[in-house]
Amino acid sequence: MKVKVFNLEGEPVEEIELPKVFSTPFRPDLIRRAVIASWTHRIQPQGRDPLAGKRRVTENIGKGHGMARVERIKTPPRFAAFVPFARGGRRTHPPKVEKIIWEDINKKERRLAIMSAIAATANPDLVRARGHVVDNVPAFPLVVVDDLQKVFKTAQTREIFKKLGIWDDIERAKRNTKIRAGKGKMRGRRYKKAKGPLIVVAKNEGIVQGARNHPGVDVVTVDNLGVELLAPGTHPGRLTIWTKGAIERLKEIYG
């Protein structure tokens, strides 16, 4: 399968053969598992001190005294201690660091999930279903010349994105940036930001600096490409711009 390569003016200049990875069957189940596994590996285990609430010298006076048979401190006023309902007592079911919080996925399954997510970027129906605005995008997958890697000015990338037909999707991402409900906005997560186009390059020669200020835009090299970037929120079909060098590197990695 051949695809057109566009220059920075949005004009086709040549055709190249797509690697076989773009013919991978669509596997949303594996993509979802791979994304969730990536999420869980960022969770930090938490626990409580095993001796919290137990550092008291207590005694149980037993029955027959007309008072509850709970552990009490030895010195007056002999408050209840140690038990969960006492002041300073232990917690009932505290979190434990031994809890298994990671979800694993086999290496071959993770590789297949990434390949399937890459193939999904070439399916216009999946890209539209994900919510991207692609009315002016000339081709799927959208492949551009390697000169894009050297653009380091935000104003220049804005004009390039307009000519490539992806600026409408960046404006959609800007409109959908909302203030988060709840206390998360007081904890460094004030804004919920929509995901816009993904730019995949063979080598960063300035494009990260030139594109990072556009709302929703992510830039990544092929070697660091992961399923979370290709399918944010477990939803495959992200609008993706590939450079010619990135396509050639894909052939080396995935065939």
From Swiss-Prot:
GO terms for biological process: translation. It comes from the Archaea. GO terms for molecular function: rRNA binding; structural constituent of ribosome. Signal peptide: none annotated. Keywords: Ribonucleoprotein, Ribosomal protein, RNA-binding, rRNA-binding. Gene3D superfamilies: 3.40.1370.10. GO terms for cellular component: ribonucleoprotein complex; ribosome. One of the primary rRNA binding proteins, this protein initially binds near the 5'-end of the 23S rRNA. It is important during the early stages of 50S assembly. It makes multiple contacts with different domains of the 23S rRNA in the assembled 50S subunit and ribosome. Forms part of the polypeptide exit tunnel. Belongs to the universal ribosomal protein uL4 family. Part of the 50S ribosomal subunit. This is Large ribosomal subunit protein uL4. It comes from Thermococcus gammatolerans (strain DSM 15229 / JCM 11827 / EJ3). The lineage of its organism: Archaea, Methanobacteriati, Methanobacteriota, Thermococci, Thermococcales. The gene is rpl4.
